[in-house]
Amino acid sequence: MKVCSIVVVILAVLLIAKLDAKIYERCELAKKLEEAGLDGFKGYTVGDWLCVAHYESGFDTSFVDHNPDGSSEYGIFQLNSAWWCNNGITPTQNLCNIDCNDLLNRHILDDIICAKRVASSHKSMKAWDSWTQHCAGHDLSEWLKGCSVRLKTDSSYNNW
């Protein structure tokens, strides 16, 4: 009975999160990422971040994926419950000090702050397999075509 109650609570939380979720348009997300200081952060461009968000979640803030090891990944950047957030189920390091469900709404500043922490780790963007497979070494300018963002001309600049 206790397990059933836990499942009901989790489903209720996910339903509420889904109601406040958003699937971002590419250029809309590019603008948010640029405004949050991701262009040039640790030498990566908004194109890198758009590419990761596309392949991880399809720009969907409510996306949750479950891994064979029992951990889950949350939000637009698919932040893992074993390392970056706490879902109350998976043993976690919770390195971003955040509840995983807080990553499932349209308010992505907390996702961005946590993603910056991931990018600042020893793995940097390689922490996302999608970046290694689809983004690294590719022309990422296509991700920004038609978007009115003010990008830094020197992507090695970092104001953080």
Curated annotation (Swiss-Prot):
The keyword Hydrolase applies. It comes from the Eukaryota. It is found in: Secreted. InterPro entries: Glyco_hydro_22 (IPR001916), Glyco_hydro_22_lys (IPR000974), Lysozyme-like_dom_sf (IPR023346). SUPFAM superfamilies: Lysozyme-like. GO terms for cellular component: extracellular region. Disulfide bonds join 27-147, 51-135, 85-100, 96-114. Residues 1-21 form the signal peptide. Belongs to the glycosyl hydrolase 22 family. PANTHER family: LYSOZYME C, SPERM ACROSOME-ASSOCIATED PROTEIN 5. This is Sperm acrosome-associated protein 5. It comes from Mus musculus (Mouse). The gene is Spaca5.
